[in-house]
């Protein structure tokens, strides 16, 4: 393992960040458009160059990983290790920024918004402060090195709500990040399926209030799922667990009043919003029959005020998402650096899907690839 360790250490030193997942450096699946190695795919729509913005990518700082290694929790008999030396070697790919930019060039991505992942909610306040500080310093330095290609979303310790609000403000004011990424639930350390906080919990109101005050983007991304009926071998933790957690998180925010208490929040839900947009009519029908805890509006109306990436993997999935939430709420997302470790082409094809969807006009394509994200991130046009 010595040579591999040396390679990882060298890359980490050059990058200052871990790019998580397995999606780097692999050839695209057959039939998808990419640039030749060393070249840049410049996406064109209707004869005009479009600066594509990817709002769903992953990153983590190795220095933060070092603080967390050898620490784990037990869930349903599984040892869940966010960062531990051997796990890191097996499950994390480390690349310097030049490798990432080359991969972006090949996939037709001009700007990537890097979200910190995995999302960890078990550290005590002191360790959480250390993790956030070093993560954000490294992320800010990387983005400053490539300001026209990379932006960052911070990590906040939601298990400590007051500290989370404080860290959020630092992310926006000090590091100039447009916002942060959060999980779909804050679980109790070592306890599966027993939340410390749902995102709608009143204890998190200081965080949501600060996000609304700052106009910060809050991206919701699932955490690792452990369940006796699925595991990493069959992929159900990802393909079922992730969209399910997103549907639950959104439902809590809607039915428990968070979106009413903070109506100006800017929330992006990755993976096309999970299962809820696909079957929100069921939630609408249920809500109309409630006598207590009834949302002020139909759930489908709240969905139209949130944002979603277009990572649906099919024309019909994208068409239905747009029909439910509106074209103005959909942005490009690739899950670059994430996705199942067994699926090497997971994040390829996101741009192709938008370019080739037969129901989209050129104006629609430009909106999803650039315009909606430009507005959401408050970028200069």
Predicted features and spans:
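Active-site gating/metal-coordination segments in enzymes
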Residues: 110-249
């Amino acid at each position: 393992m010595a040579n591999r360790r040396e390679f990882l250490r060298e890359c980490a030193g050059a990058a200052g960040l871990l790019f998580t997942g397995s999606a780097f450096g692999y050839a695209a699946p057959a039939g998808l458009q990419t640039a030749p190695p060393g070249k840049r795919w410049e996406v064109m729509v209707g004869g005009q160059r479009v600066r594509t913005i990817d709002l769903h990518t992953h990153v983590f700082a190795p220095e933060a990983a070092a603080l967390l290694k050898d620490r784990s929790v037990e869930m349903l008999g599984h040892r869940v290790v966010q960062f531990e030396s051997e796990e890191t070697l097996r499950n994390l790919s480390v690349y310097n920024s030049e490798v990432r930019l080359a991969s972006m060039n090949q996939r037709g991505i001009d700007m990537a918004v890097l979200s910190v992942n995995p999302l960890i909610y078990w550290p005590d306040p002191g360790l959480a402060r250390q993790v956030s500080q070093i993560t954000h310093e490294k992320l800010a330095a990387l983005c400053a090195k490539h300001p026209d290609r990379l932006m960052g979303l911070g990590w906040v310790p939601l298990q400590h709500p007051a500290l989370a609000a404080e860290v959020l403000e630092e992310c926006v004011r000090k590091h100039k990040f447009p916002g942060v990424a959060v999980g779909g639930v804050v679980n109790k350390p070592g306890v599966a399926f027993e939340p410390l906080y749902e995102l709608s919990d009143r204890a998190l109101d200081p965080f949501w209030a600060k996000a609304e005050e700052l106009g910060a983007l809050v991206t919701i991304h699932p955490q690792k799922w452990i369940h006796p009926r699925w595991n990493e071998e069959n992929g159900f933790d990802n393909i079922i667990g992730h969209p399910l957690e997103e549907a639950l998180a959104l439902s809590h925010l809607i039915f428990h009043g968070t979106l009413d208490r903070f109506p100006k929040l800017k929330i992006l839900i990755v993976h096309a919003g999970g299962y809820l947009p696909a079957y929100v009519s069921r939630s609408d029908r249920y809500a109309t029959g409630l006598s207590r805890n009834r949302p002020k509006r139909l759930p489908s109306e709240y969905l139209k005020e949130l944002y979603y990436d277009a990572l649906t993997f099919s024309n019909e999935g994208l068409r239905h998402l747009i029909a439910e939430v509106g074209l103005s709420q959909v942005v490009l997302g690739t899950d670059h650096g994430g996705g199942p470790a067994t699926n090497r082409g997971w994040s390829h094809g996101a741009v192709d899907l938008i370019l080739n969807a037969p129901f989209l006009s050129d104006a629609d394509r430009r909106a999803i690839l650039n315009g909606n994200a430009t507005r959401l991130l408050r970028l200069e046009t």
